[in-house]
Amino acid sequence: MKKLLFVFAMVAGTTFSASAQVQQGTILVDAYYGMPNLYKSAFQSLVSAADATNVQSGGIGPLGVRAEWLAAEKFGVGIDVCYSDAYVTEDAFGSDGMPYSYELRSPKIGIMATMNYHFVSTETVDFYFIAGGGWKNRTLTSTTDDPNYTTDSIDMSLLNIAARVGVGARIFFTENIGINLGVGFGQGSIFNGGVSMKF
C-alpha cells in the first residue's frame, strides 16, 4: 500500500504542463473493476479447505460506474454505483438419494454520493482524493432444486451504509478517453481500475 501511494505521489509531482485537464463544468465517467473480491476469496478458501471435487466457487466484481461533475476547478461531486457477487455451488445427493444442486450466493449492490478534490490536473493526468457515502445491500441466499430443502435469504448489511475514502488517478491518451486507477478502502475494493471518458 505504501509503495503504491509513493508511486502516486511521484507521478503527481512530475507535471508536464500547466494546462488543466479537467475544468469547471467537465463531466467525467469511469467504468472500473476492483480487487480483491473478499467474499469470493473467503468462499474459495472454504472450498480449498474442504478438498471436495464436487464443490465450485466463483464471483464477479466489484464492478462499477462512477460519474462526476466538476462544480469548481478542483472540486467535483458525483455518484458511484457498484455491484459484486460471490457464490459456492455443490452437486450432492439429497436425503431421498436423488442428485441435486445446492448454491450459496452473496450479491451486493451499493450506491454512493461522492466528493472529489483534484490536487493535480495536467493535460494528461488527473489526481484526486475521493470520499463518498451512501446505501448498500448485501444478502446471503441459499437455493436448490431439492424439494426437501428450504431455501433462505439473509440480509448481511448490518447498517446498509456504503462508504469509500481513497485516492485516484486518470491518465488520458486522447482528449476524451483514458484509464483510471484507484486505491482506498470501502466500496470498489482496495484496488480498482478501468476506462475513463471526459465530456
How would you describe each model-predicted region?
Residues 1-26:
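Cleavable N-terminal export/targeting peptides
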Residues 20-71, 190-198:
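Short glycine/proline- and aromatic-enriched beta-strand/turn motifs that initiate or cap beta-hairpins
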Residues 22-24, 36, 70-74, 84, ...:
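Outer-membrane beta-barrel channels and translocator barrels
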Residues 25-27, 57-63, 105-111, 125, ...:
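Residues that define the transmembrane beta-barrel architecture of outer-membrane proteins
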Residues 31, 65-69, 111-117, 131-135, ...:
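Residues on the lipid-exposed face of transmembrane beta-strands in outer-membrane beta-barrel proteins
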Residues 39-56, 82-111, 135-160:
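Flexible, solvent-exposed loop segments that connect beta-strands
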Residues 103-105, 118-122:
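Short, charge-rich binding segments
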